[in-house]
Amino acid sequence: MLIAIEGVDGAGKRTLVEKLSGAFRAAGRSVATLAFPRYGQSVAADIAAEALHGEHGDLASSVYAMATLFALDRAGAVHTIQGLCRGYDVVILDRYVASNAAYSAARLHENAAGKAAAWVQRIEFARLGLPKPDWQVLLAVSAELAGERSRGRAQRDPGRARDNYERDAELQQRTGAVYAELAAQGWGGRWLVVGADVDPGRLAATLAPPDVPS
């Protein structure tokens, strides 16, 4: 079973991935996790990160160029994802294809039914062959709370300076709205929307009931 955890920067995705992994293991399931972008492992991801911190000229100003870099990062992990899915009962991804659709649409002031989201779906799923997730879980929190967490994370870790996307509060708000639309229309497969107070054990049981094989 392939599960993608989605949400704006600072939503708490990493924490949810850790807690959900623990819940699945407690239920007797084997679990693997993978986070995107794969900074430090993927040239495409590293170039994107550098662009979001002011390098590479005007690269970051191009929505489609940045989206392509993030897509190529995931494309480079296709075989890794497939291997994990064969070797484990549950594979949990911290961000996946929907993040590209949400941020790209938000940057262009489009909604989930716009050209950017449709393009991401064609490029990543159809052209690059990314496997579709069995579930996409949207961790829906307020933009204010996400912003506070993002700022706090940067203060605690001097090496984790916020990038251009993370510093743009209006972009984060628009991205959250697009995410909600993607979930409502079932973009790319099944969605489940949860809040910051979600119980990991109950979430695991909903995503993969104990009597249903992964």
Curated annotation (Swiss-Prot):
Catalysed transformations (reactions): dTMP + ATP = dTDP + ADP
Sequence segments annotated as region (LID): 147-159
Residues annotated as binding dTMP: 9, 39, 70, 74, 95, 100, 103, 163, 165
Domain of life: Bacteria
Comment on bound cofactor: Binds 1 Mg(2+) ion per subunit. This ion is required for catalysis, binding to the active site transiently (at the TMP-binding site), and probably acting as a clamp between the phosphoryl donor and acceptor.
Activity-regulation annotation: Competitively inhibited at the phosphate acceptor site by 3'-azido-3'-deoxythymidine monophosphate (AZT-MP) (in contrast to other TMPKs such as E.coli, in which it is a good substrate). Inhibition seems to result from the impossibility of magnesium binding.
Keywords (A to Z) from UniProt: ATP-binding, Kinase, Magnesium, Metal-binding, Nucleotide biosynthesis, Nucleotide-binding, Transferase
Keyword Transferase: yes
Cofactor(s), names only, from the UniProt record: Mg(2+)
Single GO BP term: dTTP biosynthetic process
Signal peptide: none
Gene Ontology cellular-component annotations: cytoplasm; cytosol
Binding site for Mg(2+): 9, 166
Temperature dependence: Highly thermostable. Is half-inactivated at 65 degrees Celsius.
Site annotation Transition state stabilizer: residues: 153
Binding site for ATP: 7-14
InterPro entries referenced in this protein's UniProt entry, alphabetically: P-loop_NTPase (IPR027417), Thymidylate_kin-like_dom (IPR039430), Thymidylate_kin_CS (IPR018095), Thymidylate_kinase (IPR018094)
Enzyme Commission identifier(s): 2.7.4.9
Broad class of enzyme this protein falls into: transferase
pH-linked activity: Optimum pH is 7.5-8.5. Inactive below pH 4.6.
Coiled coil: none
GO molecular function: ATP binding; dTMP kinase activity; GTP binding; magnesium ion binding; protein homodimerization activity
Functional note: Catalyzes the reversible phosphorylation of deoxythymidine monophosphate (dTMP) to deoxythymidine diphosphate (dTDP), using ATP as its preferred phosphoryl donor. Situated at the junction of both de novo and salvage pathways of deoxythymidine triphosphate (dTTP) synthesis, is essential for DNA synthesis and cellular growth. Has a broad specificity for nucleoside triphosphates, being highly active with ATP or dATP as phosphate donors, and less active with ITP, GTP, CTP and UTP.
Misc. remarks from the entry: Was identified as a high-confidence drug target.
Descriptive protein name: Thymidylate kinase
